[in-house]
Amino acid sequence: LILDAENCQVQKFGENGTFIDAYGSCGTGDLEFNFEHGTGDPDGGIDIDSDGNIYIADTGNDRVVKLNSTGGFVKTIGTAGNAAGQFASPVAIEIDSNDNLWVTDEDNGGKIVKYSTEGVYGSLEIKNDLVDPASVASNSTHLVVVDTNDDEVKTYKISDGDAAPKTTFGGNGSSTGQLYNPVDVELDSSGNIFVVEEGNDRIQKFDNTGSYKALIENGTSATFDKPSAILLDNDGNIHIANTNNNTLAKMDANELV
């Protein structure tokens, strides 16, 4: 599944890249989306729960939209506002291993909101030390958050309900281990952290403590042109979405060792 922000759609492709279907259009209705952020730039996020339901961060409409596995509308989650559980530009979604729904909300001072997949507010909000939380990933114990304007990655131990960051790494720069405009993050089964940098046109790999391990730069194993999203599949492949040239790049995760 690919979120096509410019066309207000979710597009579905097969494993070989063959187009299958598209869901949605531009607007404010049940199966309509608006992915424009306050800057005018397209934004939004997508994830799938254990039953195959699809969750979309409908950024411009300040809500999350839930679809079934065939793209049919199920419900909206959240409302616009500044109160607990409300959204102002939700931009990314993560479904954790317990089917909890985590939503990054950029314009409410920077926070992450927890919901159930049925749309019940979970009363936990992470706000500490966040400026511009653009993406979130998880494993059974931790959330990993890309804080774009700080050029940092922050980890939170959600298993104990603590909203304070446990690890912070990165910092502005172009050297290995530094970050410039990081926009997306993903974890592998070993807890390694993969970070996409639009500013440096590259992907870096860190271990679960935030120590640098490897990188793929533009023009080495793939061509990057404002990379904006990353997905690790079950076969050990990395898929990267390039915003400027509207392409997907695929590579073997073992190249980052």
Q: Each predicted region: which residue ranges?
A:
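Flexible "stalk/tail and boundary" regions
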Residues: 1-257
